[in-house]
Amino acid sequence: QFNLLFNGSSLQRQAQLLMCTLNNIEAEVENLKKLTNAYMKQDLNTMFKISEERKGNQCDALPSEEDALIYNRNKIWAEKLPAIMKAAPTFVAVGALHLPGEKGLLKLLKSQGYTIEPVK
């Protein structure tokens, strides 16, 4: 992820994102609180909605950055995880925004026939 963040984008883009975050820190903190609250409630739909609402915001990832950071990685994991899970009991930990949506890791695994249950 750090390679994608720091080597996959120009210093100008990194500076733009940092300045945007600093200039909008209150809104960014509030957004993170909402996302954390939805995560703690295991409310994937709200998590996805919060993520989608940020689209077009200058502080948000560009579509190509979002693909690189989230969706392409989900696809790779969904391809690799079955062999890993077949070999041994497996606990998979990923960032919260890898979970929801049609291209989310949970949906990709369900489409392969896996049963997904939240941890309680």
Feature roles, as predicted:
Residues 1-86, 104:
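Hydrophobic, often amphipathic alpha-helical segments used for membrane interaction and targeting
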Residues 89-120:
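C-terminal structured interaction module
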